Design a protein with these regions (language model features):
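Outer-membrane beta-barrel pore domains
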Residues: 21-29, 47-49, 63-67, 108, ...
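Solvent-exposed, glycine/polar-rich loop segments of beta-barrel outer-membrane systems
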Residues: 55-57
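Outer membrane beta-barrel
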Residues: 22-51, 62-224, 231-236, 240-247, ...
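Residue-level detector of intrinsically disordered/flexible regions characterized by low predicted structural confidence
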Residues: 4-5, 81, 349
Length: 418
């Protein structure tokens, strides 16, 4: 944690820092705007496969979300939406977005957890504090807030994927040999950094080029599920300070930002707590970013094969539910524009899972490098190569399996419709 604070302090000496909360939650002008994006992706996983007594021990050697192949060409995202205003005064805004691709939203572990509606919200701007209700992205991690079509990093960091992308299990019965462990098929798609609820938010101008943004949301804790149950409510808090540095607007605004967030929610199995802080800097050709995250309770511990038939895999999610279970991690990233169309990218991330139990502790380290070739606006081709390393320092058997963890090549073509 000390090292992360030092790094954040280093970045803060600089005077993509887009304000995602305001960009996605409100409209700047009257009208109706169809939009969307398509991402075609090829991935090749260089991991080894280990099967012991018919059980596949290496889910990390396969391509998500189905874990069926080690190389795969897929439609990663296919989203179409409509946003705009419902009145001439631009006081009532709406935001709709659908997803038809067979990804983690609609086909987690090949179980067809179809839920095609990602966002459906109304924002009321009559009061000093804007009021948004419906289903939408909650304010939190920068990695989650960022529009996926704007990121040259094809997959989330390991800490973002495992700690923040919530998985919902179709069970309330613990594993036989461990009352804290739950293993089951997905009950719905991954949470996609979204929830259903009501949010109060606003960005306040402090000086000529600086802003304070605040947000509080009461969510149902159900992700993108079409059923609402406020018995499992979640509180989402967010604060950021942003200093505008130069040109650009919207997603391409040159700025420096500091932010912090906290989430505290109830679930059927246990409480789920997440919090973090970070910074972003974007000016001219250079973009820098750092974020630290920590979680307690509802710790996702990977996919498990529950079928001892050597010819088939029956993948299910596993969770260590108790609030005593903890995990933390961080990422550091940078991008640099070499020329008008070429951008070099690099990200280093670390995830420490189940830090409270030596035998269950796992550490993941990933260095992602790549290049982005811009075609037009946000249309581009991204190439990422992730060097992966995982270990179980206090569990020799698990550590041996994790040596099969391989590197991942990802190539993605993004087309933005607007």
């Amino acid at each position: 944690m000390k090292n992360i604070i030092v790094l954040l302090s280093f970045f803060s000496t600089f005077l993509s820092a887009a304000n995602w909360l305001m960009l996605q939650g409100s409209e700047s002008k009257v009208g109706h705007h169809p939009w969307g994006f398509l991402q075609l992706r090829f991935q090749d996983n260089g991991g080894e496969v280990q099967i012991n007594n018919g059980i596949n021990k290496t889910p990390f050697s396969y391509i998500k979300p189905t874990l069926q192949h080690q190389s795969e060409l897929q439609v990663a995202r296919a989203r179409l939406g409509l946003r705009g205003s419902l009145d001439d005064a631009n006081k009532i805004n709406y935001f709709l977005l659908g997803e038809v691709a067979q990804n983690g939203v609609n086909n987690s572990l090949a179980t067809h957890t179809d839920n095609y509606l990602m966002d459906a919200s109304i924002t009321l701007k009559h009061l000093p504090l804007y009021i948004r209700f419906g289903r939408f992205k909650y304010a939190g991690s920068e990695e989650g807030n960022m529009a996926r079509f704007a990121s040259p990093f094809i997959v989330f960091s390991t800490v973002g994927d495992q700690l923040m992308l919530e998985r919902f299990l179709d069970t309330k019965t613990p594993y036989v040999s461990n009352p804290d462990l739950y293993i089951a098929k997905p009950a719905e798609g991954t949470g996609a950094y979204r929830d259903t609820g009501i949010q109060l938010f606003q960005s306040f101008k402090l000086a000529q080029a600086s802003y304070l943004t605040l947000s509080y949301m009461l969510g149902s804790g159900t992700g993108i599920k079409n059923e609402i149950d406020f018995h499992n409510h979640t509180h989402y808090g967010y604060v950021s300070y942003e200093n505008i540095l130069g040109k650009g607007k919207g997603y391409k605004q040159e700025a420096f930002k500091l932010y912090a967030w906290h989430q505290d929610g109830q679930r059927d199995l246990a409480d789920r707590i997440r919090y973090g802080l970070g910074t972003t800097y974007f000016y001219d050709k250079l973009h820098l970013e750092a974020e630290y995250m920590k979680g307690k309770g509802m710790i996702y511990t990977g996919a498990k094969d529950t079928d001892n038939n050597i010819n088939t895999n029956n993948w299910q999610y596993s969770l260590q539910a108790s609030k005593k279970n903890e995990a933390d991690g961080y990422y550091l990233l940078g991008t640099y524009e070499l020329a008008k169309q070429f951008e070099l990218i690099a990200r280093y991330d670390v995830y420490n899972r189940m830090t409270n139990l030596k035998n269950e502790y796992r550490q993941f380290k990933t260095l992602t490098t790549g290049i982005s070739y811009k075609l037009k606006d946000y249309d581009r081709v991204d190439i990422n190569y992730a060097y992966n390393k995982a270990s179980a320092p206090h569990n020799q058997a698990a550590d041996q399996i994790l040596k099969s963890f391989g590197n991942l090549l990802s190539i993605q073509y993004t087309i933005v419709l607007k």
